[in-house]
């Protein structure tokens, strides 16, 4: 399937499985009359494969070592990207950032690394399923930077176009999205 065909098919899946209208309170605390819940798309076999494919194509030339983001939204996405990258013979490892470290065990903020493995000096991309203001992704960026990593990109599947671009620019972070909310609202 061509990139444009993959993108169109994924948009159809998102529209069917993950987009809705009706009043909702967003993670940012804002109210909205539409929403995206990408988990049904990320956990659908075809949706997961297309998200991984389009994301991998975006990252392929970035010389990325790791991909990850804030739990819960980034976990299935990071895993799918890591798996596809292995199949493409260009491995990109995955991690996730806890919203709050567990109060038992290793008490880690960044999970998924083997004993002795570190993000220090590694090129990382922060992925997110849906971005509104950028606040959640910036929390993940801060935790990953504390681990010594270089953030080369913040990549979201859907940008709600409600301030994230400006927030990332102010933080000096490159930002891209696979889709904009307006692509779904205007159809």
Curated annotation (Swiss-Prot):
Which Gene3D superfamilies does the protein's record reference? 3.40.50.2020
**CDD domains in alphabetical order:** PRTases_typeI (cd06223)
Task: Point out the coiled-coil segments of this chain.
Answer: none
Provide this UniProt record's keywords sorted from A to Z. Glycosyltransferase, Magnesium, Pyrimidine biosynthesis, Transferase
**Residues annotated to bind orotate:** 132, 160
Q: In which pathway does it act?
A: Pyrimidine metabolism; UMP biosynthesis via de novo pathway; UMP from orotate: step 1/2
Q: Which domain of life is it from?
A: Bacteria
- In its UniProt record, which GO terms are filed under biological process? 'de novo' UMP biosynthetic process; pyrimidine nucleobase biosynthetic process
Matches recorded under InterPro entries: OPRT, Or_phspho_trans_dom, PRibTrfase_dom, PRTase-like
The yes or no answer to whether the keyword Cell inner membrane is present is: no
Q: Which reaction does it catalyse?
A: orotidine 5'-phosphate + diphosphate = orotate + 5-phospho-alpha-D-ribose 1-diphosphate
Pfam families per the record?
Pribosyltran (PF00156)
**EC number(s) given by UniProt:** 2.4.2.10
Q: Which cofactor does it need?
A: Mg(2+)
| Residue numbers binding 5-phospho-alpha-D-ribose 1-diphosphate | 98-99, 102, 104, 128-136
Role description = Catalyzes the transfer of a ribosyl phosphate group from 5-phosphoribose 1-diphosphate to orotate, leading to the formation of orotidine monophosphate (OMP).
Which protein family is it in? Answer: Belongs to the purine/pyrimidine phosphoribosyltransferase family. PyrE subfamily.
Cite the record's note on assembly: Homodimer.
* HAMAP family linked to this entry: PyrE (MF_01208)
Q: What is this protein called?
A: Orotate phosphoribosyltransferase
Tell me what gene encodes this: pyrE
């Amino acid at each position: 399937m061509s990139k444009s065909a993959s993108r169109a098919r994924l948009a159809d899946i998102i529209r069917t499985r993950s987009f809705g209208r009706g009043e909702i309170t967003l993670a940012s605390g804002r109210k909205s009359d539409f929403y995206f819940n990408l988990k049904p798309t990320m956990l659908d076999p075809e949706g997961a494969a297309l998200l991984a494919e389009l994301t991998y194509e975006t990252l392929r030339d970035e010389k990325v070592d790791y991909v990850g983001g804030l739990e819960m939204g980034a976990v299935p996405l990071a895993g799918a990207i890591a798996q596809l990258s292995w199949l493409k013979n260009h491995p990109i490892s995955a991690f996730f950032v806890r919203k709050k470290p567990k109060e038992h065990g290793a008490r880690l903020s960044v999970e998924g690394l083997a004993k002795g493995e570190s993000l220090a000096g590694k090129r990382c991309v922060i992925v997110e399923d849906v971005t509104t203001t950028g606040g959640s992704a910036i929390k993940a960026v801060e935790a990953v930077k504390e681990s010594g990593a270089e953030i080369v990109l913040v990549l979201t599947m859907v940008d709600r176009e409600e301030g994230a671009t400006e927030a990332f620019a102010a933080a000096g972070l490159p930002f891209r999205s696979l889709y904009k909310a307006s692509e779904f609202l205007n159809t």
